[in-house]
């Protein structure tokens, strides 16, 4: 299965609410910031944004004072799982990032998708990739 298939079929899928809602954007990146696959509308990282996200996995709490930035948009960092999951909120939407052995799985949501639905979609794929040593 190609990495793009994981994004298209496992991240940009129906979130399971029975109403056909899905994430606004999703991507899988290598730990070095290389794009493995992404939805067409996934925002592009600027400057040190990706490096700062990776630093927060290594030093949990690093992003809390400044926020998480993606393409210049600021997300307030909310409770995640230190070293494993970063969650952010921006207005009625937000972001979930799950770190695996070799990659980071990103999901961005907007209403009516809920934070919990985004977490479930992103973390389910992330857990699968961890089981596959990816």
Swiss-Prot record:
Compartments it resides in: Cytoplasm, Cytoskeleton
Keyword Zinc-finger: no
GO molecular function terms listed in the Swiss-Prot or TrEMBL record: actin binding
Keyword Signal (UniProt): no
GO cellular component, one term: cytoplasm
Highest taxon above the source species: Eukaryota
A Pfam family this chain is assigned to: Profilin
Keywords, ordered alphabetically: Actin-binding, Cytoplasm, Cytoskeleton
Signal sequence, renumbered to the chain: none
Assembly with partners or alone: Occurs in many kinds of cells as a complex with monomeric actin in a 1:1 ratio.
Family to which this protein belongs: Belongs to the profilin family.
Known function: Binds to actin and affects the structure of the cytoskeleton. At high concentrations, profilin prevents the polymerization of actin, whereas it enhances it at low concentrations. By binding to PIP2, it inhibits the formation of IP3 and DG.
Protein's recorded name: Profilin
């Amino acid at each position: 299965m190609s990495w793009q298939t994981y994004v298209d079929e496992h991240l940009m899928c129906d979130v399971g609410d029975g109403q056909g809602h899905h994430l606004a954007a999703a991507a899988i990146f290598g730990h070095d910031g290389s794009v493995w696959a992404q939805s067409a509308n996934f925002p592009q990282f600027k400057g040190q944004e990706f490096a700062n996200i990776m630093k927060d996995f290594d030093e949990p709490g690093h992003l809390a004072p400044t926020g998480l930035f993606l393409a210049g948009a600021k997300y307030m960092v909310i409770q995640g799982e230190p070293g494993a999951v970063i969650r952010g909120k921006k207005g009625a939407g937000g972001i979930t990032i799950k770190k695996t052995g070799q990659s980071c799985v990103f999901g961005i949501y907007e209403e009516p998708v809920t934070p919990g639905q985004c977490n479930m979609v992103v973390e389910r794929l992330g857990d699968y990739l961890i089981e596959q040593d990816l």
